[in-house]
């Protein structure tokens, strides 16, 4: 119910900040887009899903309009002389590490691992991934989150 959802402090705060109102379309929000920023590790990425589910189940139009974005956060920062190169996945770094000039790397375990100037750079010049939905998103949502467990079982069992 609406009352139960508003008891969730995080969801309540998000609604208060963004101007989103449960039960209403996201038409008159305080911001054009909503950017989600978490640690790039498995824990941080795992925390995205409850937020996405809350947005998706209440305001799917935000996804249809490309208004939900992730702020990409670095996993590795390579120091090459006085310049830095940020990598958002280990695979991205592994792909080019042998072509980089002599460098040192620092693994970023979370946003708290960033130095103040790095954090400022990420806030002032964010790199976004826009969440895009497949055309059959309504069917998928109903299958995965709907009231018919047989649909989920069929999907999981292939």
Where are the regions that the model predicts?
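Conserved phosphate-chemistry cores used by DNA topoisomerases
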Residues: 1-158
């Amino acid at each position: 119910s609406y009352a139960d959802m508003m008891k969730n402090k995080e969801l309540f705060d998000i609604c208060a900040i963004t101007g989103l109102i449960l039960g209403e379309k996201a038409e008159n929000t305080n911001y054009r887009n909503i950017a989600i920023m978490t640690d790039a590790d498995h824990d941080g990425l795992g925390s995205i899903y409850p937020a996405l589910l809350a947005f998706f189940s209440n305001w799917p139009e935000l996804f249809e309009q490309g208004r939900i974005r992730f702020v990409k956060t670095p996993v590795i920062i390579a120091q090459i002389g006085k310049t830095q190169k940020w990598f958002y996945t280990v695979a991205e770094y592994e792909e080019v590490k042998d072509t980089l000039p002599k460098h040192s790397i620092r693994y970023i375990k979370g946003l708290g691992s960033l130095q103040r100037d790095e954090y400022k750079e990420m806030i002032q010049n964010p790199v976004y991934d826009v969440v895009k939905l497949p055309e059959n998103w309504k069917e998928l949502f109903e299958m995965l989150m709907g009231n018919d467990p047989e649909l989920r079982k069929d999907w999981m069992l292939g």
